[in-house]
Amino acid sequence: MLYLLIGGFDMSRIGKLPISIPAGVSISQKDNVVTVKGPKGELSQYVHPSIKVNIENSLVTFEIDANHIENSKQKQAYHGLYRSLVNNMVVGVSEGYTKTLELVGVGYRVSNQGNLVEFTLGYTHPIFLQLPKEVKVETKSERNQNPVITIETADKQLLGLICAKIRSFRKPEPYKGKGILFKGEVVRRKSGKSAAAK
């Protein structure tokens, strides 16, 4: 997976912040791979050799290894990047991440059988999406309310990818406000061509 390396100073400042290990969570590392286990699951993340990960006294700290010859700004970016990724894993396995999506449109429906999700979105055929086993999914359709789908997982990156995939089935459109939206999301509306011509 590709990551955007951003602003050395800010990312390095983030990298200096220690991570507290919550009760019920364990962290280990082997061969540049950090593994985090907790009540919500287990996640692993490769860490670039230029970053040293120290686990001690219920704290995880990150430091730049000066023995590795790297571009200075890239090192600083790595410093903050991997600290953020490991912190996301700690939060994920201890608390989990949840997103709720709302289907806005006449006749739109969503249902699931286990992790197989079926969407009816105004096309001539339904859309099926098989979610990974480490993901929990719940769908709800109530009278006079838009159908919703709620997704929970320990993996923040995976959650983002799944939500992006689902939204791509019916991207929010700015004229009628229809589409698949995050719960509470407000679509910035535009005037149609006929209205703009008046």
Regions found by a protein language model. Name each.
Residues 1-10:
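Short, Lys/Arg-enriched N-terminal segments with co-localized hydrophobic residues
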Residues 9-91, 95-164, 168, 173-198:
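N-terminal intrinsically disordered, cationic/polar leader segments
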